[in-house]
């Protein structure tokens, strides 16, 4: 079998060939969820909600969260009240992650000192130089490693998995997060001293709903049945294990993947009900997009986005669903 890989600088560039039909698969980040919802960078006349389906995902040993300077006595998100929290211009995903962590602690942006930065790297430089106290990131990225080695040090606020109300607030902002015991993180963290935090799958192998079922079936069989053959071949491969899959996540699975999980006895009635709800949600979004774009929407980019987000929220709420994004 011949495989051709098309690299992309960001999720939009990676998802464009999937949208146009040039490729059948995308190994994407969390923007695949934004694409399925038609929000943020996908609330654009050229995009809108996409019929995305999950093949499989990887949850590895790293986490995603707010890196905090180690010298301000922060142990959980609620301790961030009154602290200097970074906000990155033009990076919705990072800012939403920060907002979700604040929500876990019962906080909003109004409860902290919001410090704007032009980019992710500058925010970490700001922590080290004592201009700000936090930045959202992947736990194993170079910037938090640099912070850990600085005089300020680093901590990762803990998210108690038993705090049901905290998790409810967090997932109301960013439903793709899930509790995770993080063993790879900058600072004094390890298998023996994990960070009890959060993560979401990365990469997320997605296809379109109409992708050839034979391809989807072949892929999920290989990922599951040949796991022992590839799990140690590269860092993070262990995250593709069946035990690591969240079968009630935020993007629907491809029909062939659902059929396979049923075949091996791993699919429950609750999972099917969740899948049906996600597919219904996506159908509502795509029909709403079709109606909105067919009724002479504003040509101004910001007005177009605002109109779409209003129409989107109205349609989802009418169906008893949480818009999440507004």
Model-assigned labels for residue ranges:
Residues 19, 23, 71, 103-107, ...:
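Sec-exported extracytoplasmic/periplasmic mature domains
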Residues 1, 95-112, 131, 148-151, ...:
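Ligand-binding cleft/hinge of the Venus flytrap
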Residues 13, 17, 75, 93-100, ...:
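Extracytoplasmic/secreted proteins, especially bacterial periplasmic and envelope-associated proteins
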Residues 49-52, 64-68, 155-164, 171-181, ...:
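Electropositive, surface-exposed helix/loop patches at the edges of structured domains
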Residues 139-152, 156, 214-216, 224-326:
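An extracytoplasmic/periplasmic, membrane-proximal ligand-sensing/linker region
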Residues 30-32, 41-43, 72, 109-111, ...:
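Pocket-lining segment of extracytoplasmic ligand-binding domains
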Residues 1-90, 94-104, 115, 156:
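Short, glycine-/small- and polar/acidic-enriched structural segments
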Residues 82-100, 176-240, 245-250:
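Ligand-binding clefts/hinges and TM-proximal coupling segments of bilobed small-molecule sensing domains
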């Amino acid at each position: 079998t011949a495989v051709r890989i098309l690299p992309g600088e960001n999720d939009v560039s990676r998802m464009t060939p999937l949208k146009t039909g040039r490729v059948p698969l995308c190994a994407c980040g969390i923007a695949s969820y934004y694409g399925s919802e038609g929000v943020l960078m996908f609330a654009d006349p050229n995009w809108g909600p996409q019929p995305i389906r999950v093949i499989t995902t990887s949850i590895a040993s790293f986490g995603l969260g707010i890196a905090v300077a180690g010298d301000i006595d922060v142990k959980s998100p609620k301790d961030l009240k009154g602290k200097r929290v970074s906000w990155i211009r033009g990076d919705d995903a990072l800012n939403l992650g920060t907002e979700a962590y604040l929500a876990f602690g019962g906080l909003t942006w109004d409860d902290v000192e919001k410090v704007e930065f032009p980019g992710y790297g500058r925010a970490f430089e700001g922590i080290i130089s004592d201009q700000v106290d936090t930045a959202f990131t992947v736990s194993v990225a170079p910037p938090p490693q640099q912070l850990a080695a600085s005089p300020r040090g680093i901590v990762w606020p803990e998210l108690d998995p038993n705090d049901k109300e905290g998790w409810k607030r967090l997932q109301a902002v960013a439903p793709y997060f899930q509790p995770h015991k993080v063993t790879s993180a900058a600072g004094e963290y390890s298998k023996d001293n994990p960070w009890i935090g959060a993560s979401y799958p990365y990469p997320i192998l997605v296809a379109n709903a109409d992708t050839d079922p034979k391809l989807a079936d072949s892929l999920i069989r290989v990922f599951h049945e040949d796991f022992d053959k590839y799990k140690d071949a590269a860092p993070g491969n262990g995250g593709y294990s069946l035990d690591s899959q969240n079968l009630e996540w935020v993007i629907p699975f491809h029909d062939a993947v659902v059929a396979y999980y049923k075949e091996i006895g791993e699919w429950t009635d609750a999972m099917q009900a969740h899948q049906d709800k996600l597919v219904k949600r996506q159908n509502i979004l795509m029909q709403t997009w079709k109606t909105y774009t067919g009724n002479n929407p504003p040509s101004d980019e910001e007005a177009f986005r605002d109109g779409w987000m209003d129409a989107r929220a109205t349609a989802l709420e009418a169906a008893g669903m949480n818009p999440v994004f507004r």
